[in-house]
């Protein structure tokens, strides 16, 4: 069974990094409502588009999601 996207993303946290993956990891960590138990692209993408208290480049998100699928 695949780890949730959030669980995988948390391994990339690094507040000193300018890497989009590290930035998203830190933002997701601070966002209480981030979907933590899903591996569904649409659910996470919809959250980022409609409900996140932060803005994030969705093109970068698509690339990060592809890395997640390949891990």
UniProtKB/Swiss-Prot annotation:
HAMAP family according to UniProt: UPF0346 (MF_01538)
Species this protein is from: Streptococcus pneumoniae (strain P1031)
Record family assignment: Belongs to the UPF0346 family.
InterPro entries noted in UniProt: UPF0346, YozE_SAM-like, YozE_SAM-like_sf
SUPFAM superfamilies in alphabetical order: YozE-like
Name under which the protein is recorded: UPF0346 protein SPP_0954
Gene3D superfamilies: YozE SAM-like
